[in-house]
């Protein structure tokens, strides 16, 4: 029941609903009580009404604006004025507040404690300075002096230790006497003396043998060096005849710089712009082909056979004047030093008499090659490349001196024909071609090829197009015959010939790119069919030479290339399927790894076979017990003798070996020696560092670097030379850096919202009839800037003036408030004093009444 005169809650709800829906046509909302005062609106009148002009400040509400400004100042300046001269926060002013926990030494703690005590003494009253009844306990690191445990030895120095008795050895040596048999003791002493004498004689004989062996070795080395030293001395003593005036003039004319022919109708600035545009176009084309954006049709690519990307120029030694792009392909320069480019300035040697020029080159330049690490990143024009006599090919460890090279050039067999005709016809058969080359030395063979190309250039006659294709096929077959049956004695000479023929092979490729590419591709296909029949064996050495040929002749950074892509897949199949059992197979694998790294130096693609092969080489360099197994991917074996093929025995002394690269004989030798084990591991460490640098920017670089850490940590570095230690340190640091990177979560690519198709508005300049003096663009911009500065300055001065008045008002209020409080205090004091005076007067009157 509900009390009388009261409504239930349901009735109230029903009444509210009925009241709200009583008038369905009443949609007007209640007007806000805060309605603007129309008298606060200030209107700025204009003298003239101009059509089209929009005035932004024709009306305003200064009262409202002033109130908002005061409110904003109260929230900013008012708050700052209220907390002025107030310290309401804790500041750490202790000594050594910026030091961490490990850096807080005993002296810092003592200085901090002393400063705190001095501040406490200053804050207390002067009378408490001499208070001796201070109950404060002195502590050290939170402990009193009584709690600190004292480790003292309370015993005096006069006490004797319990364990100072003589031991058995001392008593047996010092005591005499006994009942032993003197004859037997004498015989034992004689036998012992005889044994000792024999041992000493054996040691002396062993030392003499070692000294004799070392002496013989030093004598042999000295005999090898003696003719070189004697020859150098003899050449230095020979006085050269002074050159006459004719020779001087001839040299000046030869080496005089020649001006480049330019079009006189084109301005040099325009020529520079055209060259910059051409280089930019080539670079964009190379990047487009690397990303495979908008691949062109095969017909369109055939229609433009002469196009070369920027990377193609680099690989072909053609882009003159460009700086090296800094690729880190493992290679060796002309001095045998490790590097990615052939540094230093290249001297431009002009071709005079070709026979004498080639002989001089053989005598003045060293021939150095590297079997598995070759660099094709030297940038130069074709003429300089043809005259260059040394390129980073397989390198020989004992370097021949310049005089020795000259001696080898001078001692040409008499059966070789040193006279080369200037016009050479194209040989009809391959037998005629080989017979022509067999009559001349290595340096002269390159000259023969050059003259055959010049005499059979396609622009001279139409039939020469087939001749250059035939010459290209002959050269490929000739390289196959050279390297297929190469031996330790002639492999160096074969690589030298390949170095000299490389620019002419490039020139032939540019004469007819389509036919030459098809010819080389057919050879690669034939080699791959042979490999498929026995994929567990490495291909022959000529196949590896073809791979290096592809790396030098074609652009390896393209996303898809008709010649490079099949070779790239072929190399990965070899590295991932062929077994590694001998010195030759290890050297071939490292050679292929270097070629692959050259392939991906620009595109930075992932090559799993390279990482697996390098892990296998490090795995074989780790000594393991017979029952110990480490995880490794085929074609490498987990256990057995092949799993530790490159491991150094414990008693091997190889710490004094000099830094050496792989030699050309490694590609044709089967026996594994300790120095080869050191060189193979050293080369692998350098290749690991380079491979990790290439994938440093990839998302999954951490997964590629982690397997190397477990293998590198197991290497026994005490058996290796110092340079191997340094290379191991560099590779380990880079692998740890990449392994520590964190993976970023996958996220869909952000798509730009598609805008609606709208008509573009047409903007027209508003004409205002204001006469302004004509100024230049720079002066007009300066005038606008000065006008804005003037307006902003006036506004800033006005705001500063208003802020000052606001602060003065706050100070006045504070002063009035303090005066009011002071007046109230004075008034209260007077009031209390008057009451007190009244009480005193009353007491004095009471005393007077008592007297009377």
Swiss-Prot record:
Compositionally biased residues, Acidic residues: 354-381
Gene Ontology CC: one annotated term: Noc4p-Nop14p complex
Coiled coil ranges: 190-221, 774-851
Localization per Swiss-Prot or TrEMBL: Nucleus, Nucleolus
GO MF assignments: snoRNA binding
Keywords: Coiled coil, Nucleus, Ribosome biogenesis, rRNA processing
Record InterPro entries: Nop14
GO BP annotations, alphabetical order: maturation of SSU-rRNA; ribosomal small subunit biogenesis; rRNA processing
Region (Disordered): 1-40, 288-324, 338-410
Compositionally biased tracts (Basic and acidic residues): 344-353
Keyword set includes Coiled coil: yes
Residue ranges with Polar residues bias: 20-35
Keyword Nucleus tagged: yes
Assigned protein family: Belongs to the NOP14 family.
Function of the molecule: Involved in nucleolar processing of pre-18S ribosomal RNA. Has a role in the nuclear export of 40S pre-ribosomal subunit to the cytoplasm.
Subunit structure, as described in the record: Component of the ribosomal small subunit (SSU) processome.
Protein name, UniProt field: Nucleolar protein 14 homolog
């Amino acid at each position: 029941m509900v009390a009388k005169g009261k409504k239930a809650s349901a009735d109230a709800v029903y009444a509210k609903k009925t009241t709200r829906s009583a008038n369905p046509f009443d949609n007007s909302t209640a007007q806000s009580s805060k309605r603007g005062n129309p008298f606060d609106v200030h209107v700025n009148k204009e003298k003239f009404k101009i059509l089209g002009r929009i005035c932004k400040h024709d009306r305003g509400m200064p009262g409202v604006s002033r109130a908002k400004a005061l409110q904003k100042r109260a929230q900013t300046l008012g708050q700052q004025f209220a907390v002025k001269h107030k310290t309401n926060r804790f500041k750490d002013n202790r000594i050594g507040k910026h030091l961490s926990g490990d850096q807080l030494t005993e002296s810092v703690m003592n200085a901090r404690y002393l400063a705190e005590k001095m501040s406490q003494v200053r804050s207390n009253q002067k009378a408490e300075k001499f208070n001796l009844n201070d109950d404060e306990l002195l502590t050290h690191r939170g402990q009193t002096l009584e709690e600190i445990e004292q480790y003292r030895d309370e015993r005096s120095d006069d006490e004797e230790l319990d364990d100072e008795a003589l031991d058995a050895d001392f008593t047996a040596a010092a005591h005499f006497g006994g009942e032993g048999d003197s004859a037997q003791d004498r015989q034992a002493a004689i036998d012992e003396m005889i044994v000792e004498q024999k041992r000493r004689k054996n040691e002396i004989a062993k030392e003499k043998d070692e000294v004799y062996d070392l002496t013989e070795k030093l004598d042999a080395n000295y005999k090898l060096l003696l003719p070189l030293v004697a020859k150098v001395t003899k050449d230095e003593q020979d006085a050269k005849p002074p050159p006459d005036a004719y020779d001087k003039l001839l040299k000046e004319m030869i080496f005089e710089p020649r001006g480049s022919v330019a079009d006189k109708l084109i301005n040099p600035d325009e020529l520079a712009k055209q060259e910059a545009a051409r280089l930019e176009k080539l670079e964009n084309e190379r990047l487009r082909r690397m990303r495979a954006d908008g691949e062109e049709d095969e017909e369109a690519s055939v229609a433009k056979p002469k196009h070369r990307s920027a990377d193609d120029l680099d690989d072909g030694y053609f882009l003159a004047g460009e700086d090296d792009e800094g690729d880190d392909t493992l290679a060796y320069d002309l001095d045998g030093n490790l590097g990615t480019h052939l540094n230093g300035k290249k001297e431009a040697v002009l071709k005079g008499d070709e026979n004498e020029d080639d002989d001089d080159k053989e005598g003045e330049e060293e021939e150095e090659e590297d079997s598995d690490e070759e660099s094709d990143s030297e940038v130069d024009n074709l003429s300089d490349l043809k005259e260059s006599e040394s390129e980073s090919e397989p390198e020989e460890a004992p370097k021949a001196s310049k005089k020795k090279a000259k001696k080898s050039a001078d001692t040409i067999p008499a059966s070789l024909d040193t006279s080369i005709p200037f016009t050479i016809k194209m040989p009809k058969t391959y037998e005629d071609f080989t017979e022509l080359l067999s009559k001349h030395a290595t340096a002269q063979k390159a000259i023969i090829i050059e003259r055959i190309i010049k005499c059979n250039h396609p622009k001279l006659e139409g039939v020469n197009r087939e001749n250059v294709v035939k010459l290209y096929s002959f050269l490929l077959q000739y390289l196959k015959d050279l390297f297929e049956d190469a031996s330790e004695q002639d492999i160096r000479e074969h690589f030298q010939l390949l170095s000299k023929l490389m620019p002419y092979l490039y020139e032939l490729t540019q004469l007819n790119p389509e036919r030459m590419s098809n010819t080389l591709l057919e050879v690669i296909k034939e080699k791959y069919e042979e490999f498929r029949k026995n994929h567990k064996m490495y291909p022959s050495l000529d196949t590896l030479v073809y791979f290096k040929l592809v790396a030098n002749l074609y652009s390896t950074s393209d996303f898809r290339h008709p010649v490079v892509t099949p070779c790239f897949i072929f190399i990965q199949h070899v590295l991932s399927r062929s077994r590694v059992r001998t010195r030759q197979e290890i050297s071939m694998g490292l050679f292929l790894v270097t070629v692959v790294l050259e392939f991906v130096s620009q595109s930075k693609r992932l090559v799993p076979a390279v990482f697996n092969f390098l892990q296998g080489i490090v795995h074989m360099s780790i000594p393991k017990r017979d029952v110990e197994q480490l995880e490794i991917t085929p074609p490498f074996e987990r256990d057995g003798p092949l799993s530790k093929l490159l491991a150094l025995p414990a008693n091997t002394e190889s710490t004094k070996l000099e830094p050496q690269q792989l030699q050309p004989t490694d590609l044709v030798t089967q026996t594994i020696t300790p120095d080869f084990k050191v060189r193979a591991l050293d080369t692998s460490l350098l290749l690991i560092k380079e491979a990790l640098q290439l994938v440093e920017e990839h998302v999954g670089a951490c997964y590629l670097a982690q397997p190397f850490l477990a293998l590198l940590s197991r290497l026994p570095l005490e058996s290796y030379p110092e340079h191997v230690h340094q290379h191991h340190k560099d590779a380990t640091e880079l692998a740890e850096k990449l392994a520590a990177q964190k993976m970023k979560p996958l996220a869909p690519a952000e798509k730009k919202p598609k805008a609606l198709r709208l008509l573009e508005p047409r903007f027209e300049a508003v004409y205002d009839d204001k006469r302004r003096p004509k100024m230049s663009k720079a002066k007009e911009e300066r005038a606008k800037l000065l006008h804005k500065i003037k307006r902003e300055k006036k506004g800033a001065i006005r705001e500063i003036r208003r802020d000052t008045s606001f602060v003065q008002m706050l100070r006045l209020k504070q002063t009035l408030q303090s005066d009011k409080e002071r007046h109230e205090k004075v008034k209260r004091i007077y009031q209390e004093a008057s009451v007190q005076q009244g009480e005193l007067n009353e007491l004095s009157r009471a005393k007077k009444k008592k007297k009377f």
